UniProtKB/Swiss-Prot annotation:
Protein name: ATP synthase subunit beta
A GO MF label: ATP binding
EC nos: 7.1.2.2
Binding site for ATP: G155, G156, A157, G158, V159, G160, K161, T162
SMART domains for this protein: AAA
Lineage, broadest ranks: Bacteria, Bacillati, Bacillota, Bacilli, Lactobacillales
Catalytic reaction(s) noted: ATP + H2O + 4 H(+)(in) = ADP + phosphate + 5 H(+)(out)
Source domain of life: Bacteria
Membrane topology: Peripheral membrane protein
Cited function: Produces ATP from ADP in the presence of a proton gradient across the membrane. The catalytic sites are hosted primarily by the beta subunits.
Similarity comment text for this entry: Belongs to the ATPase alpha/beta chains family.
Length: 468
């Protein structure tokens, strides 16, 4: 194990000098530096650049407070390695695989794997056309998720990405079992804490591994924590042959941390100040999130859209890797429609008659047609009022409004805020409900009866309570 000495510390960037005869550590190797003489407080550094003349530039995974010039640095000879396997289930840990849930730390002999790996080769990949039922009507009907696919939840600040991810974790864990890995990348610690206790209460935590690198941590940790979560998911897929769910909240923070690291390393920024290696970094992460012949990884990624601008390089780069996109729209939150999923902007490769079936496809496309026509008529209604519409158009507007409200539903994870029980709606019930609305079966029921309900039977009960 070769050793060097700290030459300079600039925030999270640490330059380390190795003696001229020593072998320099490789890029991505983990280096260890002890803050104190009794070797209780260590900091892990990751090699990012070789500057020449025995000097390497590293990024710290923890705060560099207390580091001084001249401290000894040890090369571990390998990349950061994290615990994998069944021992990780029910536990919460950081980017380095250290437990942060106040329970017993992992044993020394636990299986560990490096966080940097190659993506599976082309001949190992497998594709599936099986739908993953989520119990959320708007998703299952208009932008269904594929088992083993990649899903992006796009939205600006405060439109409900994290709540939607939490509901998906709840529904999929309760209905499908299976193993989940939740990776919190640069998000709020409070939300992670809430999620942990919720999962503990519901018993879902026993089948979930949780990894966090939150907002307050150095950019190195936020940039690498997604790889830590992915490494755990890959082990369950490749070694145990499991179907794994990988939740990442938020993939934009991964890009943001990469941008900070890039600037600290002195690279010239690219478009909108992002790192020049944006597409490469995103590609290296996303290409590893895939399904092989041994098992599948279905990934659901929240993607923050800065200033609601979808042309921003960060969300635009992520778009290219996804099978399904669920777009959250601020206008819908203002109308009180939750989840605020835009039914026309959201899309899925799975919405085809070969995968979802003829009836589902026909109902979904008709729902989109009615909503699109309603959107076109809104300008006329705003200027001239409803009276200028033909009878046929008035009927269409009535149905479109009922459909728009029926696309909303109460969430189990939001019950503590709304006081209303959440609902899980099977795909067959979702398709039947929308088909009957399109047929005009419920034209007489008030629009408000369709708001925030589960299956169509709930609408009828709500209308009866309202006196219809």
């Amino acid at each position: 194990m070769s050793s060097g000495k700290i030459a300079q510390v600039v925030g999270p960037v640490v330059d380390v000098m190795f003696a001229s005869g020593d072998k320099l550590p490789e890029i991505n190797n983990a280096l260890i530096v002890y803050k104190d003489s009794d070797k209780k407080q260590k900091i892990v550094l990751e090699v990012a650049l070789e500057l020449g003349d025995g000097m390497v530039r590293t990024i710290a995974m923890e705060s560099t407070d207390g580091l001084t010039r001249g401290l000894e640095v040890l090369d571990t000879g390998r990349a950061i390695s994290v615990p994998v396997g069944k021992e990780t289930l029910g536990r919460v840990f950081n980017v380095l695989g250290e437990t942060i849930d106040l329970e017993e730390p992992f044993a020394e002999d636990v299986d560990r794997q490096p966080i940097h790996k190659k993506a599976p080769s082309f001949d190992e990949l497998s594709t599936s056309s099986e739908i993953l039922e989520t119990g959320i009507k708007v998703i299952d009907l208009l932008a269904p998720y594929l088992k083993g696919g990649k899903v992006g939840l796009f939205g600006g600040a405060g439109v409900g990405k994290t709540v939607l991810i939490q509901e998906l974790i709840h529904n999929i864990a309760q209905e499908h079992g299976g193993i989940s890995v939740f990776t919190g990348v640069g998000e709020r610690t409070r939300e992670g804490n809430d999620l942990y206790w919720e999962m503990k209460e519901s018993g879902v935590i026993e089948k979930t591994a949780m990894v966090f690198g939150q907002m307050n941590e150095p950019p190195g940790a936020r940039m690498r924590v997604a790889l830590t979560g992915l490494t755990i998911a890959e082990y369950f897929r490749d070694v145990e042959g499991q179907d794994v769910l990988l939740f990442i909240d938020n993939i934009f923070r991964f890009t943001q941390a990469g941008s900070e690291v890039s600037a600290l390393l002195g690279r010239m920024p690219s478009a909108v100040g992002y790192q020049p290696t944006l597409a490469t970094e995103m590609g290296q992460l996303q290409e590893r999130i895939t399904s092989t012949q041994k098992g599948s990884v279905t990934s659901i990624q929240a993607i923050y859209v800065p200033a609601d601008d979808y042309t921003d390089p960060a969300p635009a780069t992520a778009f290219a890797h996804l099978d399904s996109t669920t777009n959250l729209e601020r206008k819908l939150t203002q109308m009180g429609i939750y989840p605020a999923v835009d039914p026309l902007a959201s899309s899925s490769r799975a919405l085809s008659p070969e995968i979802v079936g003829e009836e589902h496809y026909a109902v979904a496309t008709e729902v989109q047609r009615v909503l699109q026509r309603y959107r076109e008529l809104q300008d006329i209604i705003a200027i001239l009022g409803m009276d200028e519409l033909s009878d046929e158009e008035k009927t269409l507007v009535g149905r479109a409004r009922r459909i728009q409200f029926f696309l909303s539903q109460n969430f189990n994870v939001a019950e503590q805020f709304t006081g209303l029980p959440g609902s899980y709606v099977p795909v067959a019930d979702t398709v039947r409900g929308f088909k009957e609305i399109l047929e005009g079966k419920y034209d007489e029921l008030p629009e408000d009866a369709f708001r925030s309900v589960g299956p169509i039977e709930d609408v009828i009960k709500k209308a009866e309570k309202m006196g219809f």
